[in-house]
């Protein structure tokens, strides 16, 4: 518990140094700190995203075979599961990506710690058109929703059937949440979403060059 509080306190101290000592102001300090933290996670997040994209590409190629298994064993769930497992093993796939899950868990304390630091560490200062970063702002809420949609839309190997829901639902939830959180937190969401979108586009370009997109 003390370690967690120390981590949040460290991030708040860094935010204060950037805002006051460096003269960036709180708004710009939030953007710079968020970008710095996300950049430090690139070795992990890029590896996870690349693994996930390759896995999705393999699953997409197996879709016809998986559909055939479901049709052939429609009344026998056990046989359906066994055949699915066999097919996955033949193509080097596991039912769950353990390394991907572990990697996601490892980055959560960093990202959530930054969120907590900004939730309580942003004072009542102005930034651009925002008079008070400690209060919600409707324009920022809209921008947060748009950036969320952009980040989701940039993800590689998204099925057309799920595309609309995967893009719209998180965007709507982000908009509603941003209306109830401080502008500092909304600014963090926008920054991290734009970073995610840029990384996803770079990943799509890499996969396309590798012939897997």
Question: Which positions does each model-derived feature cover?
Answer:
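Helix-loop-helix
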Residues: 1-213
């Amino acid at each position: 518990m003390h370690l967690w509080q120390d981590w949040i306190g460290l991030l708040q101290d860094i935010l204060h140094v950037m805002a006051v000592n460096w003269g960036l102001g709180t708004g710009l300090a939030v953007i710079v700190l968020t970008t710095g933290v996300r950049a430090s996670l690139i070795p992990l997040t890029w590896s996870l995203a690349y693994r996930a994209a390759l896995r999705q590409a393999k699953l997409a190629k197996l879709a016809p075979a998986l559909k055939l298994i479901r049709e052939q064993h429609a009344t026998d769930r056990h046989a359906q599961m066994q055949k699915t497992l066999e097919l996955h093993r033949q193509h080097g796939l596991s039912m769950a990506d353990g390394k991907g899950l572990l990697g996601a868990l490892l980055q959560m304390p960093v990202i959530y710690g930054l969120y907590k630091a900004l939730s309580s560490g942003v004072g009542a200062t102005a930034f651009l058109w925002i008079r008070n970063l400690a209060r919600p702002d409707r324009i920022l809420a809209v921008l947060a929703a748009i950036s969320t949609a952009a980040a989701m839309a940039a993800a590689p190997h998204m099925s057309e059937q799920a595309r609309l829901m995967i893009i719209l639902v998180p965007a709507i939830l982000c908009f509603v949440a941003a209306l109830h959180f401080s502008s500092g937190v909304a600014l963090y969401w926008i920054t991290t979403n734009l970073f995610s979108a840029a990384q996803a586009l770079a990943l799509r370009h890499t996969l396309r060059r590798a012939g897997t997109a």
